[in-house]
Amino acid sequence: MSIIEFWLEAKATIDRLIEQFLNSNRDWDLVDISSYILKDGKRFRGTLNMFFTVALGGDIKDSYGGALAIEILHSASLALDDIVDLDATRRGDKAAWVVYGNRKVIFITNYLIPTALRIIQTSYGDDALNTSIELWKDTSVGALRDMYDNSDYIRTIELKTGSLFKLSTVLSAYASKHYNTKQQMLDVGKYLGIIYQVIDDFVDYKTKKVEEIDGSAKQLFKYYREGKLEEYVRSVYLEYKQKYDELISNIPFQSKYLSEIRSLPEFLANGLLKEANIDKI
């Protein structure tokens, strides 16, 4: 099965898990807001968790708790980001705060986030919970650096984006019971997250006016101004793809998945580029 086929099947499964999660909480007064926040989405992060779980020899059903929790955390973080950034659209529709207002969205995300962490603890234990809390803290630090510190672009995107990718991949070590691969799987997520975000920031320069650029992409302006944006982005992509390739050679993945594992950086990058009608870097 190709990674695209796996993603399509995993996405359908994650959508079903989210629907079941919402149906089990029909007593919420704010269930409609939760449904709105969690709807749609590419489900890349949850898919990575499911994919690496089976690649490590685990049962895909053991990844369901992690995949669900990751997508809840990701969607909640986006809803909060939209409030902070005053972004009026999300996933092709109005942002949740535009529809429901800031207060309700903040209240419901404050419920969703600990609920997701509880799912992780219930599914994989206290060590997985502690790891998840530390990564969620890193996400918050990354958001602060994104807004107020332009000193280290790579560190910013590792924290801002890489942390949830790291959560996606490290939970596969727990789900597959390959606990000895925990640090390696954290690094897998780190490298994929950096690759994903640098391409995403590059796309911003190709699809927006310069004055509309915000977030971590603003830290790339000096390369844009000097006419070196493509060169820099390509160098980051190749550097972290090489690190990723070297790393996965030392992880006990099942051989039948190795080809698709190696293709993941290209899959993530090309997905972002093609969505923006960009052929290549």
From Swiss-Prot:
GO terms for molecular function: hexaprenyl diphosphate synthase (geranylgeranyl-diphosphate specific) activity; metal ion binding; prenyltransferase activity. InterPro entries: HexPP_synthase, Isoprenoid_synthase_dom_sf, Polyprenyl_synt, Polyprenyl_synt_CS. Its EC number is 2.5.1.82. Pfam families: polyprenyl_synt (PF00348). Binds 2 Mg(2+) ions per subunit. Mg(2+) 2 binds at residues 81, 85. Keywords: Isoprene biosynthesis, Magnesium, Metal-binding, Transferase. Its cofactor is Mg(2+). GO terms for biological process: isoprenoid biosynthetic process. Highly thermostable, remains fully active after 2 hours at 80 degrees Celsius. Mg(2+) 1 binds at residues 81, 85. It is an enzyme of class 2 (transferase). It catalyses: 2 isopentenyl diphosphate + (2E,6E,10E)-geranylgeranyl diphosphate = all-trans-hexaprenyl diphosphate + 2 diphosphate. The keyword Magnesium applies. Isopentenyl diphosphate binds at residues 42, 45, 74, 91. PANTHER family: GERANYLGERANYL PYROPHOSPHATE SYNTHASE, SHORT CHAIN ISOPRENYL DIPHOSPHATE SYNTHASE. Belongs to the FPP/GGPP synthase family. Catalyzes consecutive E-type condensation of two isopentenyl pyrophosphate (IPP) molecules with an allylic substrate such as geranylgeranyl diphosphate (GGPP), farnesyl diphosphate (FPP) or geranyl diphosphate (GPP) to yield the medium-chain product trans-C30-hexaprenyl pyrophosphate (HexPP). GGPP is the physiological substrate. This is Hexaprenyl pyrophosphate synthase. The gene is gdS-2.
